[in-house]
Amino acid sequence: MNKPTILRLIKYLSISFLSLVIAAIVLGGGVFFYYVSKAPSLSESKLVATTSSKIYDNKNQLIADLGSERRVNAQANDIPTDLVKAIVSIEDHRFFDHRGIDTIRILGAFLRNLQSNSLQGGSALTQQLIKLTYFSTSTSDQTISRKAQEAWLAIQLEQKATKQEILTYYINKVYMSNGNYGMQTAAQNYYGKDLNNLSLPQLALLAGMPQAPNQYDPYSHPEAAQDRRNLVLSEMKNQGYISAEQYEKAVNTPITDGLQSLKSASNYPAYMDNYLKEVINQVEEETGYNLLTTGMDVYTNVDQEAQKHLWDIYNTDEYVAYPDDELQVASTIVDVSNGKVIAQLGARHQSSNVSFGINQAVETNRDWGSTMKPITDYAPALEYGVYESTATIVHDEPYNYPGTNTPVYNWDRGYFGNITLQYALQQSRNVPAVETLNKVGLNRAKTFLNGLGIDYPSIHYSNAISSNTTESDKKYGASSEKMAAAYAAFANGGTYYKPMYIHKVVFSDGSEKEFSNVGTRAMKETTAYMMTDMMKTVLSYGTGRNAYLAWLPQAGKTGTSNYTDEEIENHIKTSQFVAPDELFAGYTRKYSMAVWTGYSNRLTPLVGNGLTVAAKVYRSMMTYLSEGSNPEDWNIPEGLYRNGEFVFKNGARSTWSSPAPQQPPSTESSSSSSDSSTSQSSSTTPSTNNSTTTNPNNNTQQSNTTPDQQNQNPQPAQP
């Protein structure tokens, strides 16, 4: 190829490339202007507006008007320079250099997204203000069209307002936790001072809160708040806004420095605080909007009377005799037909001064013990055909965790030998549970749990009798919310419904979004019925006698977690039976409820009557919900048949010779309720060799046992 030909080829390619670039620019520009033509109009009234959201219960009665409680706007000349430096350091280094969008930041975010295959933001401070004012923050709404509109409005705002005015809008717009809107409001209520009278570390704390105000709340999460404050200070030092000496002094200042006691900021009943926190979270999850900064009407699923009654059960001795005021309770109640959360409460004696603090009802940081057995072991075994009846014989005998030399112990260190599946669950024996999980297989059990809304990063044989996991963060493991929803699938015949706190949102422009819960099939109807039939006996003759009600068809399971040998030796130092957590999960045809009890400090043990509180809270609440409602029992579905006390799948051979029916619980001792812990005679629940129980080491509590009762011998419940 000669030189002139090469030159012509280069010229042709150059022109073609340039044409493509121009075409791309024109096309991109056309698309951009199409998107921005649909953007909302920039309005100062929206930038400075005091928004509020009204929250309603399931009867459309107003519960709360959020956003109207506390808002004191700062004036531009009252904003200290150190606060401005702190905000731009942590949020937008080049705020004073760009005109609404930071192209360098956008390019950096783009490159990081390519490298990590994830989505990272490149929004400048002005764009954040626009987003807070006009748009959803949901990841699913981070579309090209939305980003184009956001950038366009940011550029427009930069042309119409000064940097100082934009900062003032932002400072007054952001939510600052505990019912405080705007940084001036937070300064007054956290420190009793105006912004211009705060110290450097105090201003750094406020500057760092808007990205996750409840997570960085210095009252509820002081460690996280301190880490965030110190990150802000580090950025200020890196940007040259403060000296190394100022930095060292500030980071060594206690996070509590200057904090005053919170005053109640809420205009809603204290018993609604935990529930409203979950409403806020679910609204943002489902719509992308934060109702604390975006005005809307939210219609929830809470039964306010039930919520109030649950509060009364927690905070009076009228229903349950609590051993002390420090023992804590967390529970969730769902409608089994649709997953609607009708009531939820995360603690007793909650401070009225903290809004939207920790809600233990949704936390997964405590162990749910043997309440996991029905959903991890026995239901999967029935679902996948490992067992064909509730009379299937399982083995309660010396057994090691599969693949190890570590023995599985029952709570009493004894063994019942060959027993029925029903009796193993009724008496909460650990060995048959672990053996069953081994037969099911870890992968199939994990899949089954996922179908019930419970996930683990990985599952282990110890999960046969506990929910312990080292990775929690609310995603993994169990909580009262997750367990109530999971057990609801037993109650309704096998369908899992995601817990729902909201059913409709009406936005400020009049548009509506409704939320229906279709549900997904988690197990066969036959599996759900067989599990229910077995768990009925847990309340009648097993470990759940404190929840028993003679007139109410219901089923459930107890749970108890354990201390390690090291914890007992170093911290507990008692020969009494103790536990860090006591649980109960149960249900009727209408409602499912899960209850956690324990102390905030896990090393404070439950002992004596404290170990009966979970079941008694459940019984009190189910009594309230079910009295006068003519509660119905479950009907045996097609595909099953009954032989005496047991249920068999069609086609399964019934070789079991049924004994005489179990004696129903006595109604003559109802005055003592189920508070009695006196051992009575054993029920007649079958075991092929109950008389040969062995107990090699009855006095030692081991870390891997999961006891659910204090009495060695099974006894009928008292109504």
UniProtKB/Swiss-Prot annotation:
Disruption phenotype: Not essential, it can be deleted. GO terms for cellular component: extracellular region; outer membrane-bounded periplasmic space. It comes from the Bacteria. It catalyses: [GlcNAc-(1->4)-Mur2Ac(oyl-L-Ala-gamma-D-Glu-L-Lys-D-Ala-D-Ala)](n)-di-trans,octa-cis-undecaprenyl diphosphate + beta-D-GlcNAc-(1->4)-Mur2Ac(oyl-L-Ala-gamma-D-Glu-L-Lys-D-Ala-D-Ala)-di-trans,octa-cis-undecaprenyl diphosphate = [GlcNAc-(1->4)-Mur2Ac(oyl-L-Ala-gamma-D-Glu-L-Lys-D-Ala-D-Ala)](n+1)-di-trans,octa-cis-undecaprenyl diphosphate + di-trans,octa-cis-undecaprenyl diphosphate + H(+); Preferential cleavage: (Ac)2-L-Lys-D-Ala-|-D-Ala. Also transpeptidation of peptidyl-alanyl moieties that are N-acyl substituents of D-alanine. The active site is at 91 (proton donor), 370 (acyl-ester intermediate). Residues 654-719 have a biased composition (Low complexity). Signal peptide: none annotated. Residues 652-719 are annotated as: Disordered. One of its GO terms (molecular function) is serine-type D-Ala-D-Ala carboxypeptidase activity. Disulfide bonds: none annotated. The keyword Transferase applies. It is found in: Secreted. Pathway: Cell wall biogenesis; peptidoglycan biosynthesis. Residues 62-223 are annotated as: Transglycosylase. Its EC number is 2.4.99.28, 3.4.16.4. Residues 297-611 are annotated as: Transpeptidase. Its main location: secreted. In the N-terminal section; belongs to the glycosyltransferase 51 family. In the C-terminal section; belongs to the transpeptidase family. PANTHER family: BINDING PROTEIN TRANSPEPTIDASE, PUTATIVE-RELATED (PTHR32282), PENICILLIN-BINDING PROTEIN 1A (PTHR32282:SF29). Interacts with MreC in the elongasome. Cell wall formation. This is Penicillin-binding protein 1A. The gene is pbpA.
